[in-house]
Regions:
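Basic, low-complexity terminal or inter-domain segments flanking catalytic cores
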Residues: 2-5, 16, 23, 98, ...
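Core structural elements
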Residues: 139-151, 168, 198-200, 254-266, ...
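C-terminal helical "lid" subdomain and adjoining coupling/linker elements of P-loop NTPases
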Residues: 158-162, 177-228, 274
Length: 720
């Protein structure tokens, strides 16, 4: 009897699915995307405005397609079990065409977690391929190819060869460039404060001492203004003989609510803040947790639900499991009477998806720690705690706000000081988890000082008045967390695009990281300026969000993809032709990037220039000084030991039988990691560690020994 064939994307997912399905099925992996638009040409029919794409099977997937085609002929039924989103639907469609699988044999199965229950339910309820989802993904791919292929030549002619533009990446770059312009234009404003220490009477050491700050002039609306030291000294002099008493005491109970379960963007943000994982690293590790890991007696099982989602929905079974766990672990007081639900705030969130959660609450992080590597454990621990905390009761605080009057001043003016204090009376979800905040964000003050018992009309002693000078601060640069948050809030891209977009900006040298924050390079600023001037629609945040909305409509069957592209392309085509004719070339000195390196010949700074053989370091004193040297080229891969960029280096002497070129950490000598073979951006499909190139077409993983063809780039959602 022929076995049914199940096709998934990766070997790890295939192993986990195979274990649950048993011997009547054979699960094989496509190793990701198998077809794409051709390299080196547009691959889209423009003459008749049908935008019909031409797809080629990727070179490194031809052998895999042949194997899948053979296996499909031997199978009675072929189940396409790729990921449960538009990209997964498109992969299934491409597999059907590339492997020439008869449609009558094919069934589509969808699951959001790789567990026995979820897989059994999916295979009991197969469906046909969803043409609307396929069309939405195809429209995205075609649109991004149109934008990338038409804009990039404009940059080559007006800025520098080898540059790229894209519908999502260019708008993300604009956010970084605009923020830098805000910072540069910011003018700090001086302001002053007066902090004070008060004591109950009679004084008894530090007992009954608390802090307050001047707030207002009685009878005058708004906060008191102290723009400079002169005004502040006037107030201090006025307060010399003042007497103080409690005007009012206001007490209330305050609630602190838990954060919603993770969606893709919030997981990337929190993993950066708490774990210092890049968005890309977070998604690699989350993929491992989703596809399945061996956890002892359970065998291989998916530990979390699908990690590309913008929905905060949680399945009823998981909610019930969380409530039961909370009651048994923390007590009934910590579990609400009914499940907590969180409203969707992301534009176009796909409600069929779930939030990112553990597939079993009972699989506590510490119980499976020995089966996970450090990165896997830390991310799983974060996801598990976030979900459980989201189903716990609020933390409760007794908050007190005290108004203190200052009378008897020399000018007759009466001032108001304010003090606040807060005491946690019930930990609630904080017994397990507390969300971090972005760098540069205003911290949420809990007013944590413990105020003494105070009564209205009670006299107080002022122990000291401390003036303080302050200056307003510019908006902070974006971190990975805050940039992902901005992309999400403004509807730029989708969960699958956040990580590759950030990686593209770095790899193209459009931005650099300065103490963990994104700063645009001169090149990035020049590219943004040119594109914003000549392609205002493409660079408009609202336009990008509108496109995402239209893609959502296509996915929902409310719109056809060809008319959407026709509406976009004609004005875009005119803008490209006009820019090629009218745009001025960007002067070289506006894109030459300054460096910290000093010229060995004359002592002037070295700058990064571009020549016919690529980028290099040149003395800024050229042509008086002609000193130049090779530039360390980033290879687009993070150092596995410290997370810095890996760069290409040259050894001073070549060892016999070895090339002088090797690849080392840019953080040398602090980090000494190095390899002789070129690191590849795609992780090992077996263990997700680093792959290196072996010759022109093969790859190898030093960690697990995997060998296979070099994977082709699969960042299909972001135009390059």
């Amino acid at each position: 009897m022929a076995k049914d064939l199940v096709i998934v994307e990766s070997p790890a997912k295939a192993r986990t699915v195979q274990r649950f399905l048993g011997d009547d099925f054979v699960a094989l992996a496509s190793m990701g995307h198998v077809r794409d638009l051709p390299k080196g040409k547009m691959g889209i029919e423009l003459d008749d405005r049908t935008f019909k794409p031409t797809y080629d099977v990727m070179d490194d997937k031809k052998k895999i397609i042949a194997e899948l085609s053979k296996a499909s002929k031997e199978a009675e039924t072929v189940y396409l079990a790729t990921d449960p989103d538009r990209e997964g639907e498109a992969i299934s469609w491409h597999l059907l065409a590339a492997a020439k699988i008869p449609a009558r044999k094919v069934k589509r199965v969808v699951f959001h977690e790789i567990t026995n229950t979820a897989i059994s339910e999916a295979f009991a309820n197969p469906r046909d391929l969803d043409r609307d989802l396929i069309d939405a993904q195809q429209a995205r791919r075609v649109l991004d190819r149109l934008v990338g292929y038409r804009l990039s030549p404009v940059l080559w002619g007006k800025v520098r060869r080898g540059l790229s533009a894209g519908r999502v990446q260019s708008v993300a770059l604009r956010l970084v460039v605009d923020r830098e312009a805000e910072i540069a234009a910011f003018v700090p404003r001086e302001y002053w404060s007066i902090e004070s220490n008060f004591s109950k009477r009679p004084q008894n050491g530090q007992e009954g001492v608390f802090e307050a700050s001047i707030h207002a002039i009685k009878g005058v609306k708004g906060r008191i203004s102290m723009p400079d030291e002169t005004r502040t000294r006037e107030i201090l002099t006025d307060l010399t003989d003042a007497t103080y008493k409690v005007d009012s005491v206001r007490k209330r109970q305050r609630h602190s609510r838990p954060a919603a379960p993770f969606i893709t963007s919030t997981m990337q943000q929190e993993a950066y803040r708490k774990l210092r994982f890049t968005a890309r690293r977070t998604m690699v590790v989350a993929q491992q947790l989703y596809e399945g890991l061996n956890v002892g007696d359970e065998g291989s099982v998916g530990l979390i639900t699908y990690m590309r989602t913008d929905s905060t929905n949680v399945a009823g079974q998981a909610l019930a499991e969380a409530a039961s766990y909370i009651k048994s672990k923390f007590g009934a007081d910590y579990a609400p009477d009914k499940p907590r639900f969180y409203s969707k705030k992301v534009k176009g969130a796909q409600e069929a998806h779930e939030a990112i959660r553990p597939t079993s609450i009972l699989r506590e992080p510490d119980k499976i720690r020995s089966f996970l590597n450090n990165e896997q454990f830390r991310l799983y621990d974060l996801i598990w705690k976030r979900l459980v905390a989201s189903q716990m009761k609020d933390a409760l605080f007794d908050s007190t706000s005290v108004s203190i009057g200052a009378a008897g001043c020399k000018s007759g003016t009466e001032y108001e000081f304010r003090a606040s204090g807060s005491v946690m009376t019930f930990r609630g979800f904080r017994a397990l988890y507390l969300e971090d905040i972005d760098a540069g964000s205003e911290p949420v003050s809990e007013g944590s000082q413990d105020l003494p018992h105070l009564a209205e009309g009670e006299g107080l002693d002022c122990l000291k008045l401390d003036p303080g000078q302050h200056f307003t601060q510019p908006p902070p640069r974006f971190t990975e967390a805050s940039l992902v948050k901005a992309l999400e809030e403004q509807g730029i891209g989708r969960p699958s695009t956040y990580a590759p977009t950030l990686a593209t900006l770095m790899n193209r040298d459009y931005v650099r990281k300065d103490r963990g924050m994104f700063a645009p390079s001169k090149l990035g600023a020049a590219v943004t300026g040119l594109l914003t001037q000549h392609f205002p629609d493409i660079m408009d945040v609202s336009f990008t969000a509108k496109v995402e909305g239209e893609l959502d409509e296509i996915a929902g069957g409310a719109r056809k993809w060809t008319p959407m592209l026709q509406e976009f392309y004609s004005p875009f085509d005119e803008s490209v032709k006009r820019a090629l004719k009218e745009a001025e070339r960007v002067p070289r000195d506006q894109i030459d990037e300054e460096t910290d390196e000093i010229c060995e010949q004359c002592g002037k700074p070295m700058v990064i220039k571009s020549g016919r053989f690529g980028r290099f370091l040149s003395c800024s004193g050229f042509p008086d000084c002609k000193q130049s040297q090779p530039l360390l080229q980033r290879v687009g891969v993070e150092c596995p030991e410290c997370g810095s960029d890996l760069v290409e280096r040259q050894a001073r002497k070549a060892t016999k039988g070895r090339n002088k070129r090797f690849y080392g950490c840019s953080n040398y000598p602090t980090c000494t990691f190095a390899v002789n073979q070129r690191p590849l951006p795609q992780p090992c499909p077996e263990c997700s560690k680093m792959l290196v190139a072996m010759g022109r077409s093969n790859s190898r993983c030093a960690a697990c020994g995997f060998k296979g063809p070099i994977p082709e780039s699969e960042t299909l959602d972001v135009a390059v």
